[in-house]
Amino acid sequence: MVSDNSGNLYIVAAPSGGGKTSLVKKLIEMVGEIEVSVSHTTRPMRPGEKEGVDYFFIDEKQFISMVNEGAFIEHAKVFNHWYGTSVAQINKRLQFGIDVVLDIDWQGAEQIRHAYPDAVSVFIIPPSLDALKERLMNRRQDKDHVISERMTKAQDELGHYPEFDYLIVNDDFEKAAMELQSIVIANRLRIEKQVNKQAKLLSFLLSSQ
């Protein structure tokens, strides 16, 4: 769908509480020319979140209207709330050579891979289920029954890891962030990307023989 001069598309997925959002934010700090695609959602805004930065917060009527208009490249209902990724947002950035990261769940990842076969997908897993539960509890965002639901769903989500290109264990946050950064840097150096980016240099070097 995009040329070799365009940006790269990355999918980062994980079970709820797996740390994907924190890792993606760290990745943006570490790497230039890369942005997070801001999704639309019908869930309530959480403390500390900002409109248009973390999500575009809309009601269900607006969301369904956007679905019917074909505004989303992927959308899914997760824990009774809708999430969707804007086609226009992704394509605009890719066309300008900006890498785009999608912070989504495995359902969204599956839809994205169909639309963008060259997308690079990364699955983040916790070091243990106990660690995952502890992280969910430490967030202080959900009631006990919601945490139980998330833990049950997490075991199903973890079973989808073979569908992804890369697997990162988020045990040591800094190490996991560096591994995610390494994937992005290595992908940028692929021959099909470099052959256009370094066309002038390659031409000069070869003509000097």
From Swiss-Prot:
**Originating species:** Legionella pneumophila subsp. pneumophila (strain Philadelphia 1 / ATCC 33152 / DSM 7513)
Q: Do the record's keywords include Nucleotide-binding? A: yes
Pfam families in UniProt: Guanylate_kin
Protein's name in the database: Guanylate kinase
Query: Which positions are tagged coiled coil?
Result: none
Chain positions recorded as ATP binding sites: 14-21
HAMAP family reported for this sequence: Guanylate_kinase (MF_00328)
Q: Where in the cell is it found?
A: Cytoplasm
Q: Can you quote a single GO CC term?
A: cytosol
Lineage, broadest ranks? Bacteria, Pseudomonadati, Pseudomonadota, Gammaproteobacteria, Legionellales
